[in-house]
Amino acid sequence: MSSMAGDLGFIGVSTQHSLIQKLFPLWVDVLGLGEAKLRGFDHPPGVSLADMRLQVEQLRGDSSLAGALVTTHKVVVWECAKGLFSESDSHAQRLHEVSCISRNSEGELVAHAKDPLTARWAINQIVSPEHWQRFPEAEVLILGAGGAGLALAWVLLDSNEKPARIHLTEVEAGRGSQVRDHLKEFSQELWSLHEINSPEEADLILAKLPPQSLIVNASGLGKDRPGSPLSTSADFPSECHIWEFNYRGSLEFLHQALRQQRKQRLHIHDGWEYFLAGWAYIIAEVYHFELTEPLFAKLREAALPLRPIH
């Protein structure tokens, strides 16, 4: 790859505190991206549409930026700047969000929503598609119906091999209509939205899951905010697969599962590989290379010294 690859923008809230600041230089060496740097652009939650549009306009006009990754402000970028993109992929159009900004051969901006791609890759590392054939009664509980949780639900529903049912929980009042709109193409015999007010209500859904089900913390709790979407009294069903989307933070949900791992014979996964894949797919899009399994293995190996220990 070219030593003139350009820098990668990072549009977030507190970009200097992200582990990617240490990881990106290691990956630049693996990928042969020369002098490419990571440049953070911080905006508070609730940033105005005008300010974010100005940010995207600045990115468009700065030819030294090859593209950008967007974290917290995915929906805002779409709302304020969709007219600034010469192209938008099908996921960005469907989800009305942007997690990756690249440039085409003319230098024009292209919008991508990469969460579905990352979710599809990650879920196949945790449970194989054959899992739902082997355990046809197994279900999925996604605790949190935000962007990442919704992307996972969509990927599972869009697959040839599906769980018996997918449950999504949502505590944010008024978000239910958005969730239903995103999943409207799928039969409601396959999924349920539970609009809940407390962790104890989530416990009740958890208690009814069959063995070999998948339980996912997509709530954001345990990362930037302490807590778990389940109460401290929650009991995981036996032989379930537990997926904590987060890889850092207080990780209460993960520790709940670890305490029950031996007794309930749980299969537990944190969000480390999901984090790596999310960044790797976006870097591949921005710098226009194919992310093969052997290449991802090299990136995973380079990142290993930075992995937090739980």
Question: Predicted regions span which residues?
Answer:
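NAD(P)-binding Rossmann-fold cofactor-contacting core
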Residues: 161-190
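Rossmann-like NAD(P)-binding element
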Residues: 60, 175, 199-230
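Rossmann-fold NAD(P)-binding glycine/threonine-rich loop
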Residues: 100-103, 222-295
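Glycine-rich adenosine-cofactor-binding loop
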Residues: 12-14, 111-116, 123, 127, ...
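Short beta-strand element of Class I
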Residues: 38, 163-167, 240
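Phosphate/diphosphate ligand-binding glycine-rich loop within oxidoreductases
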Residues: 3-131, 249
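Short, conserved loop/helix-junction motifs that constitute active-site signature segments
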Residues: 2-3, 134-136, 159-161, 208-210, ...
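Short glycine-/small-residue-rich Rossmann-like dinucleotide-binding loops
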Residues: 72-73, 217-221, 246-247
